Amino acid sequence: MSSSVTGEPIPGGESLPFPPTPSGSIAGRTMQESVYSPRPKERRLHDDAPNILIVLIDDAGPGLPSGLGGEVNTPTLDAMLQDGVGYNRFHTTAMCSPTRASLLTGRNHHRVGNGQIAELANDWDGYSGHIPRSSATGPEVLRHYGYSTAAFGKWHNTPAEETTAAGPFDNWPTGLGFEYFYGFLAGEASQYEPNLVRNTTVVLPPKTPEQGYHLSEDLADDAIGWLRRHKAFDADKPFFMYWASGCLHGPHHIMKPWADKYAGKFDDGWDAYRERVFARAKEKGWIPPEAELTDRDPTMAAWDEIPDDEKPFQRRLMEVAAGYAEHCDVQVGRLFDELDRLGYRDDTLILYIWGDNGSSGEGQNGTISELLAQNGIPTTPAQHIAALEELGGLDVLGSPKTDNMYHAGWAWAGSAPYKGMKLLASHLGGTRNPMVVRWPAKVTPDPAPRTHFLHCNDVVPTLYDIVGITPPRTVNGVPQDPVDGASFAQTLVEPGATGESSPSTSRSWAAGRSTTTAGWRPRSGHAHPGRRVRPVASATGARTTTRGSSTTWTRTGPRIGTSPSSTRRSWRNCGNCSRSRPRRTMRSPSAAGCGSSHCIPNSGSRRRTRAGSSPATRSACPSSVLPRWATRTTGSPSTSPRRRIRAECSTHWEATPADSRASSTTATSVTSTTCSS
């Protein structure tokens, strides 16, 4: 195996597309005076440039896959864990459109106009829903260098009003670097009757539900067909494929035999499931042995609080979801098998990302129609159960008759061991997703997970680094924005590889936000639809919930990178620190720099700890680089408690750089104390 996976820089890529190669032919006055010289076939890529396949699962947390301690069978992901390397501190944005835009461009999601989902696109900077031409996608750049590019499945990066058959098409996949697309332009789709598009043409599914159609199978079939055509017509060109299934997003649609495989497996509920997953994740080494399981949120219903006559409904919803997830992973396996059959296995770099955010609690109390929950239409589980009886009972869950989605308690369990879930950018349950990388030609399998702090905007710069591409200054005449991510290529072959500094990343959405800079993570969490799940007695008997918000600082480990650039425009950057590039680690969270509070250790203060844990010296929080939302207070606690944002500091247990696995999860002793800096 190679000790390096980075490619030699390819010259001449500052401006794309490349200028045409002049012809060597000369047209004279006569045939005898003319000279014909065949134009050489252009190849700018190195001979060992790999094929690239990115698999992105939807709305799936780390507490589900069997290979990571979960109870959902994922044979393909499990095999990749044996054949590749896993990353247990890879981060998303807690929301689908932002994660996908960041993943495909290598930039912060606000920089590329995707601060929220495409359906909520508006005229505000950062929220337009348009990936700007000043931030060319990775596939667009790779295409100019000679890659064939194709995308399959969910495309959630086009404003809804631009997704009709009338176009415009410049913000569709084929306008953003992909030569071929087959899938749907939305956040979700029926798995039995999806609205499909091939390139820019609306098409019907090849089969009906009665004939056995399922979207995940169709996407695998079409991708396999594309691979075969590529092998036949462009065998000398490497390919970039983006395969983004709509699973595990609602509605949870799967054929009954797949759901029946899990009958009885979840009878003891989400609390017990979460504890089992946590214990097995430790056994498998995915989380550190000293980690502590985070508590259930006060707004989340305990399984014991669910009425006995409602529990069969809640169990079956999870059985259906588990069958749905396994079925999708099996389709990914079919795609991998075709790569092997075509001889692509060794030279294909695969990134299997399990979730664009954490598991989704948008089903709230469990529903037979997820849109009822998402649109705030009040219902009770009893009403859903009564409707199911008219449709045929629990067995119709997962069928075309329902658009079911499980209780948020299952989403919380599926995001174990972390707190939160999808939409909660303030907590790791919304933003920390497993990633497994396989590249047989270059990467030696390693059963121990990599613990480097990574973000989805690191993927594109990593691919550039491997191929030998320098980010272009202009693309199609448009000056390019800087790439925010940093390459983690060398960590594929060197488990101990580290960067020199801690660049910033941010994750934010209306339901919460967090950012990471200089090894700190301030976060602000708010109530969201997935948390309206705890039954509270009221005069009418209706279920209500409590709301609130909080902001805390959490210490994180060092992040791979080359420069401490911020990705939030609200940062107040310290120029001297940026110039001196101080190194920060878990042992030395502060370093010589500008002399401001975030560069001065506050060794005289000690943080409070949970009972049984040892105190650790706390360094001053980086207050001079606090985002404005982490420092402001609106209203007084007595007059507007829901609007008050507390600026606090908190740290993890103390860890050393040599034991980076100790910082691989925040599911350990974390306490808060008011910042003194």
Task: Please give the residue ranges for each predicted region.
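Glycan-recognition/cleft segments
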Residues: C649-S672
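Substrate/cofactor-recognition hotspot
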Residues: P589-P601
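Formylglycine-dependent sulfatase
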Residues: M1-T544, G548, G557-N576, S588-S590, ...
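Cytosolic coiled-coil signaling helices that couple upstream sensory modules
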Residues: T551-T552
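Carbohydrate-binding surfaces in secreted/extracellular proteins
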Residues: S677
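Polyanion-binding and phosphate-handling cores
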Residues: C577-R584
